[in-house]
Amino acid sequence: MDMDKWIFIKTKFETMIAYLSGAMEFADDEGSGWRKDLTKWLDLNLGHNVYDPVIQSAELIKKYGASDYRNWKESDPKRYAEFIRICVDYDIETVRNRTDYLICLWDNNVLKGAGTHAEVTLAYESNKPVFLINKIPKADLSGWIMACSTKIFNDFDSLKPYLLDKYR
């Protein structure tokens, strides 16, 4: 095979990107711990990249000088909503157009927020696989979220062999 054909074939394959969805606003450490662990695993075992909204939010906070944005919720609600809207728009664009599948940690922390619900729904609407790690009693899991999920797992240890089989 000549070099031109090899380069074309090599560049034709793009790295898959997973969106790591889950609670941030009401979660300890904004949910960064499980996302860091899964990011390493996906890279090491599948060569997949991730979109980590915790990291992206930190970049947006810096870009827009919003280090104290959480205080704005009560002190300046309009400013708070404007900044959150920037984050929401970025996340919507990313789920729809920049990622290949979504991994979601569904626990009690997501129940007070709205972003995770929206991300799961957007991924479903965009025909992207949604792999849900359910940490609440099945009786309490929303039928909507169940319907939007491609497959539901009890823990990350159950998800990993499935991903290996599907993507390796």
PLM segments and residue spans:
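Conserved catalytic or regulatory cores that recognize and/or transform ribose-phosphate-containing ligands
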Residues: 2-168
